[in-house]
Amino acid sequence: DQVDKESQKRRPTNVTKVARAVKPRAANGIDQVVFYHEGVGTSGPLDSFTGGAFGSGIEANVRDLYRFIVYNYEPGDELYMFGFSRGAFTVRTLAGFMALVGLLEKDDDYYVPEIYACYESGDKPGSPAWLKAFHNIEGTRPCPPIRFLGVWDTVGSLGAPGMLGQIFNGKKYAYHDVEL
């Protein structure tokens, strides 16, 4: 999530409302885990400026979210990701990263920064940088199913996150509303 105007900080965003609406246990008895992250530009005036002007902090947020999934995902789980503005860019980037890398084992989380740097650099899997990053990793788990990716006002000036096409090859539904 991301809000950069002082007056809007007091009002919950759509992402906040969705996070608050999720019950800890679904009607069918399945546990539901919510991880809410306020996003870049929310911890003070300097953070607001650097996050707003340059997207500063997005990489760290992607890595934090990825680690949360590494530690909490169990086979059979489904992921629902939501984001607003730079938060939308963040969850789209996270989805692309997971599509390319899969999920590391918990014991390999130490390598997340190095692997993410390879992803961010645009190097292709199999390149020397990727081989070095994965040198001590025996393998990864497949990318978890992303059941829903809900984004509002994605920040386009930061570029399009890579690998999004691979995530949604088997999509059931896709909606895009450009009119308000």
Model regions and ranges:
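Alpha-helical segment proximal to the catalytic Tyr-Lys
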Residues: D1-L180
